[in-house]
Amino acid sequence: MVHAEAFSRPLSRNEVVGLIFRLTIFGAVTYFTIKWMVDAIDPTRKQKVEAQKQAEKLMKQIGVKNVKLSEYEMSIAAHLVDPLNMHVTWSDIAGLDDVITDLKDTVILPIKKKHLFENSRLLQPPKGVLLYGPPGCGKTLIAKATAKEAGCRFINLQPSTLTDKWYGESQKLAAAVFSLAIKLQPSIIFIDEIDSFLRNRSSSDHEATAMMKAQFMSLWDGLDTDHSCQVIVMGATNRPQDLDSAIMRRMPTRFHINQPALKQREAILKLILKNENVDRHVDLLEVAQETDGFSGSDLKEMCRDAALLCVREYVNSTSEESHDEDEIRPVQQQDLHRAIEKMKKSKDAAFQSVLTHVCLD
């Protein structure tokens, strides 16, 4: 039986040290056990680890040294694109000479020749640029070429990156987007299909989503207060009418990337077929006249179909043992005509499907 006086007597030095040691061990074991359990039940843990490794690799590639990044900035850095690895230049874009000229004057020149513009607030590069127009007309290509030519770090931001199941994490990720961009400036934050992320706000929006959007716009406004900051938010959309009016205000520089006109289609066709095996008698102006309403993406797919016709014809006319690439005939005018008809039927079928859906609604 333990006497009552045993509890009332003071502890010896060895007993105190032993108690502290046991409590320390217990606390450490408890901490790491809880941490392991939280990591085990987190379905995104593996993706976060991979994202951190990818971010560290990209930071080395772009030559960023002695820049300390937070956990959230590392998550965003995984979406960095090294300008040197962008194999897109202005020469890869045809039919948009006016847009390219304006972009060079308003965006690229103030970044590359900063010393010429530093004394004027009016001549600073815009903090927001919107590229809008029908799908398949080169909006994303223009954004990449702009970053390449300006030598900017390119953050290809996916809206899903900013969503997190834990309350408050989305706001921290939104803050990390801008803090990372500032550390890596000059930089471009590119948001493709920006209407899906920053569309018109309504009372039906989830609280976390509304707070994240508000945080994003608040940080975006902060770029305007620092006129020496070289961070640009560039968005692309084919539904500008769905964008929140507050977002439109923050993107004063807008470029309409419309479907190519006749001369633009001819220039695009020349670019697509420049290094292909094409018959010298092919009249690209005639092809351009027959492709009214085609986007740049449609023209590329049409040319691909025409080239495949030549390959299919060769494969069907020879045995497997005698295949020789040199014997494949060049693309002729008739191949392009057949590909155009196929593309028109495909577009008409898609249009009829949309009309049927609208009528049923």
Curated annotation (Swiss-Prot):
PROSITE patterns (alphabetical): AAA (PS00674)
Enzyme class: translocase
GO biological process, alphabetically ordered: extraction of mislocalized protein from mitochondrial outer membrane; learning; memory; negative regulation of synaptic transmission, glutamatergic; positive regulation of receptor internalization; regulation of postsynaptic neurotransmitter receptor internalization
GO CC annotation: glutamatergic synapse; mitochondrial outer membrane; peroxisomal membrane; postsynapse; postsynaptic membrane
Effect of E193Q: ATPase activity reduced by 60%-70%. ATPase activity reduced by 92%
Positions bound to ATP: G133, P134, P135, G136, C137, G138, K139, T140
Chief place of localization: mitochondrion
Keywords: ATP-binding, Cell membrane, Membrane, Mitochondrion, Mitochondrion outer membrane, Nucleotide-binding, Peroxisome, Phosphoprotein, Postsynaptic cell membrane, Synapse, Translocase, Transmembrane, Transmembrane helix
Membrane topology: Single-pass membrane protein
Gene Ontology terms, MF aspect: ATP binding; ATP hydrolysis activity; membrane protein dislocase activity
EC code: 7.4.2.-
InterPro entries: AAA+_ATPase, AAA_lid_3, ATPase_AAA_core, ATPase_AAA_CS, Mito_OM_Translocase_MSP1, P-loop_NTPase
Pfam families hit by this protein: AAA, AAA_lid_3
Function noted in UniProt: Outer mitochondrial translocase required to remove mislocalized tail-anchored transmembrane proteins on mitochondria. Specifically recognizes and binds tail-anchored transmembrane proteins: acts as a dislocase that mediates the ATP-dependent extraction of mistargeted tail-anchored transmembrane proteins from the mitochondrion outer membrane. Also plays a critical role in regulating the surface expression of AMPA receptors (AMPAR), thereby regulating synaptic plasticity and learning and memory.
PANTHER family referenced in this protein's UniProt entry, alphabetically: AAA ATPASE, PUTATIVE (AFU_ORTHOLOGUE AFUA_2G12920)-RELATED-RELATED, OUTER MITOCHONDRIAL TRANSMEMBRANE HELIX TRANSLOCASE
Name this protein carries in UniProt: Outer mitochondrial transmembrane helix translocase
Source organism: Rattus norvegicus (Rat)
